[in-house]
Design a protein with these regions (language model features):
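Outer-membrane beta-barrel pore domains
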Residues: 60-196
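Aromatic- and glycine-enriched pocket-lining scaffold segments that form the walls
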Residues: 1-61, 65-69
Length: 196
């Protein structure tokens, strides 16, 4: 099975204002630059996003996606984020992951504001789906045939970039291991607990 999609959207990143205020950085990566305001077209440049997925057999899927747009108010610098992902499920076991790399174009004005040239990150996650029969017999209204628990363990690694106190360009790496437990009452209702 092969699926694909492509969209043209309003650009959603507000990375560099005309007065030199940068919103990309080492603390929150690209997150602080998302606009999300109604009718907000910061630099009147569209964003283009696309995705292709391929599933050679039931239970396995891999895909690639990309997003690109101008990120600065002067409409002179491009942000491009390609990503790869996969999901493999066999019985109650599931393994998935995703990796992305942000290519950030920087002219002299963007460099002077401290905009980094790149950032990247990935995660790998293992899941196990289960439902103890004791719980189903104890309370069949709460623990139905459609309900399930999922134990998960996720490894994240992210590298953001910015400037240090001496205004030297540096990269910061973050690693995180996150165990978690989810209870899904129905497909659309889930309670999640995790420890970071």
């Amino acid at each position: 099975k092969l699926d694909y999609e492509i969209y043209v959207t309003n650009g959603v990143f507000r990375g560099l204002d005309a007065d030199g205020e940068a919103r990309f950085g080492e603390v929150n990566g690209l997150r602080g630059s998302k606009s999300g305001y109604v009718n907000d077209n910061y630099n009147e440049s569209p964003g283009i996003v696309g995705r292709v997925t391929f599933s050679p057999f039931i239970g396995f899927e891999f895909g690639g996606s990309a997003y690109t747009c101008r990120y600065d108010e002067n409409n002179e610098n491009q942000l491009t984020i390609p990503a790869l992902d996969f999901t493999y499920q066999r019985g109650p076991f599931e393994f998935l992951g995703e990796g992305a790399y942000a290519f950030i174009e920087t002219d002299n004005f963007a460099e002077a504001a401290g905009i980094p040239g790149d950032m990247w990150g990935y995660y790998l996650e293992a899941r196990y789906h289960f439902m103890p029969s004791l719980l189903k017999s104890w309370s069949p209204r709460i623990f139905t045939d459609n309900s399930t628990f999922t134990g998960c363990l996720r490894w994240d690694q992210v590298q953001t970039a910015g400037r240090d106190d001496n205004f030297e360009r540096v990269h910061w790496g973050r690693n995180r291991l996150t165990p978690g437990l989810n209870y899904r009452y129905t497909e659309d209702t889930v309670i999640k607990l995790d420890y970071q």
